[in-house]
Design a protein with these regions (language model features):
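Bacterial N-terminal signal peptides
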Residues: 9-21
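Sec/Tat signal peptide C-region and signal peptidase I cleavage site
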Residues: 21-27
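Early extracytoplasmic/lumenal segment of secretory-pathway proteins
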Residues: 28-92
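A structural signal for short loop-to-beta-strand junctions that line the ligand-binding cleft
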Residues: 77-81, 99-145
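Short beta-strand->loop
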Residues: 99-110, 161, 257-273, 282-284
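Ligand-binding pocket segment of bilobal, Venus flytrap-like solute-binding proteins
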Residues: 171, 175-264
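Conserved C-terminal helix/tail region of periplasmic/extracytoplasmic solute-binding proteins
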Residues: 230, 338-369
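Mature extracytoplasmic/periplasmic domains
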Residues: 277, 282-343
Length: 369
């Protein structure tokens, strides 16, 4: 969602008070190297961690699971805490990429939400290697006024028909459509829309999903997994297939800017993917004690709530819900109710051969060749 630090972000981070370490740390320094998704941390959380513990944080970001996985598989990644999505976590555990968590060093895991840990155990049996950080859904973000202008005042956006019927998406082309650069999000949605298993590994099914997305390709301005947040907030685009919390962050930014852009998010009635992003410690981490301190800190109810309040993502910390803004906690697009949860599905890990097919088809979709 790999994005480096821009000059503005670097200055902001330094002003916030946490360390971006560019030179080797002295032996007496305590440091933790943290590799997280773009736009996935409240601004003062790491600064406060440094103030409380004296541990410097080297913070880098990425915007695709494949980027993280490539770094981890190569070995000697240099990171102590990383944030893989669950369906990647599953195969990474098999590849012995992560250390088992010593839960005696993570007392705040007592705050974990059983519903989330149960889902996560599908990928990490026994919850041995990872703790949930945030979770959300893949759905449709849209500019409310533009959607009403295009489709009428009573327009409904809560269907994949808006995206996967070319005649519908074509209406949004001029005001701008973005789509996640993630086959693992788009193909399952397309498969479900076609009435197929979102987890299908049959090449014929995957070809059908690719063909469906190829038909709407002419109306997609950009495939990217983080730029849409700003573009939606400023009114540069009017429709995106994106992640729930990112769309909600765009909504908050637009409201703060008072730019007249009103943003909505919909979980399509046909069903949508539910994903889990998780905290894990690489097997070759060099600062393990500091990694445990960071994960335990992030699992404090007040810290988890601060992140959810800023990010508009649900988290895996049940105790934090008492501290979460009611507007977020009661928003069914962020914390889905039972009816909405019943429409959600999760993605399981694919074998390498299937993943190669998916990657090839995704390249074909994006390039049109």
């Amino acid at each position: 969602m790999m994005q480096g630090w821009s000059r503005i972000r670097l200055v902001a981070a330094l002003a916030a008070g946490f360390a971006i370490v560019s030179a080797p740390a002295r032996s007496e320094d305590r440091v933790v190297n943290f590799y997280n998704w773009s736009n996935y941390m409240a601004p003062d959380v790491l600064a406060n961690f440094t103030k409380e513990t004296g541990i410097k944080v080297v913070y880098d970001t990425f915007d695709a699971n494949e980027t993280l996985e490539t770094r981890l598989l190569a070995g000697k990644s240099g990171y102590d805490v990383v944030v893989p999505t669950a369906y990647f976590l599953q195969r990474q555990i098999t590849a012995h990429i992560f250390q088992k968590l010593d839960k005696s060093k993570l007392p705040n895991l007592a705050n974990a939400w059983p519903m989330v840990t149960q889902h996560l155990s599908t990928y990490d049996p026994g919850n041995l290697y990872a703790a949930n950080y945030m979770w959300g859904t893949t759905g449709i973000g849209y500019n409310v006024k533009m959607a009403q202008k295009i489709l009428g005042p009573d327009a409904r956006i809560d269907s994949w028909d808006i995206v996967f019927k070319p005649e519908n998406l074509a209406k949004f082309k001029d005001c701008g459509v973005h789509m996640l650069d993630s086959a693992d999000d788009i193909f399952p949605a397309a498969l479900g829309y076609l009435g197929l298993d979102p987890n299908s590994t049959k090449q014929a099914d995957l070809e059908k999903a690719a063909d469906l997305v190829s038909k709407i390709r002419p109306y997609v301005r950009k495939f990217h997994s983080s730029e849409y947040l700003s573009a939606l907030a400023t009114g540069e685009i009017c429709l995106v297939v994106g992640w729930s919390g990112d769309v909600m962050q765009a909504r908050s930014r637009a409201a703060e800017a008072k730019n007249g852009v009103e943003i909505g998010y919909a979980i399509p009635e046909e069903g949508a993917q539910m994903f889990f992003d998780n905290l894990a410690i690489p097997a070759d981490a060099q600062h393990v004690a500091e990694a445990y301190e960071l994960i335990n800190y992030l699992y404090r109810p007040d810290v988890a709530a601060k992140n959810s309040n800023f990010l508009s993502y649900a988290n895996g910390n049940l105790a934090s819900q008492k501290l979460i803004d009611p507007k977020i906690l009661n928003d069914k697009n962020i914390y889905p109710n039972e009816t909405t949860l019943s429409k959600l599905f999760v993605i399981t890990a694919r074998d390498p051969a299937t993943q190669r097919i998916i990657n090839r088809l995704w390249t074909r979709v994006k390039t049109g060749r």
